[in-house]
Amino acid sequence: MTTRVPAPLLALAAMVSVQLGAAIAKTRFDEVGSVGAATLRLVIGALVLALVVRPRVRHWTRAQWTAAVLLGLALGGMNVFIYVAFATIPIGVAVTIEFLGPLVLSLAHTRRWRDVSWAVLALAGVVLLGVGPTAVTAVAGVAAAVAAAVCWAGYIVMNQRVGAAIPGIDGLALSMVVAMLVSLPFGLHSAVAGVVDDPTLLLVFAGVALLSSVLPYALEMAALRRMVTRVFGVLQSLGPAIAALAGLLVLREALSVQEVVALACVTAASIGVTLSGRRRRAVP
């Protein structure tokens, strides 16, 4: 079925699915709290993935275990911190700040002065967010989004190592279990209390886990089989804009003009770095 759909549309659908799941999860923060929501998503996602994949870990080496555990720590931190950020700042702003993680990681590997312009553009976006009304009134949320950005950068690095060290998606399945364990001490109580009061929350967060984890992974995997990674990277750069749109439609979170300009700066810088990086790798 997915072979009939253009690959770029699959990649865009994956991003829309992720941000829609996040927006839906935020609508239930009053019942389970932000960390409780992250915990429910991770628990359901980890259990489903573990049951489907059934990772064969018996003969793993110490290096394979280390890589998978470190990936899980990064994944757990990324999910918990970004949900904490969602609780106090708009989703569009939080995802824009979080997106600085992979952007800075890309810039750290550059050796060309031309790419400095993209760093300056991204810095302009950071400054605009830093002096905007959201940053002034919700310092904790901004700090949580920055922590999520750091975890996202770590997730990218460790995901590459896990992919190289462990065949298939067995490493990802175990990493999801580790991420779940990371969240349990902080969100188990509020998650259980919310579910006891309203058992239908299990269905809601099963949908969130599907939208935020299972479906995007399947769509991205199908897209990457039929498109070059340069185009995929450019499309991924639209994440902050899609997050802002999801926040507006689902949560009525309107961004200020200053925040929209900041979002545009970070998105443009990410696209520029992606295109520049792919061109460099194409040169013999």
Positions of predicted regions on the chain:
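Juxtamembrane C-cap of transmembrane helices in multi-pass membrane transport proteins
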Residues: 16-32, 44, 79-89, 97, ...
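Specific alpha-helical transmembrane segments that line the substrate/conduction pathway
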Residues: 36-47, 75, 83-113, 148, ...
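Helix-helix packing/entry segments at the starts of transmembrane helices
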Residues: 40, 95-97, 158-180, 213-249
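Specific transmembrane alpha-helical segments of multi-pass solute transporters/efflux pumps
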Residues: 17, 50-94, 126-128, 209-227
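Juxtamembrane helix-entry segments on the extracytoplasmic side of multipass membrane proteins
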Residues: 3-8, 31-35, 39, 60-65, ...
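Glycine-/small-residue-enriched transmembrane alpha-helix faces in small-molecule transporters
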Residues: 1-36, 73, 77-81, 124, ...
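Transmembrane alpha-helical segments that form core, pore/gating elements
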Residues: 49, 105-106, 133-191, 205, ...
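Hydrophobic transmembrane alpha-helices of multi-pass small-molecule transport proteins
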Residues: 100, 114-133, 246-248, 258-277
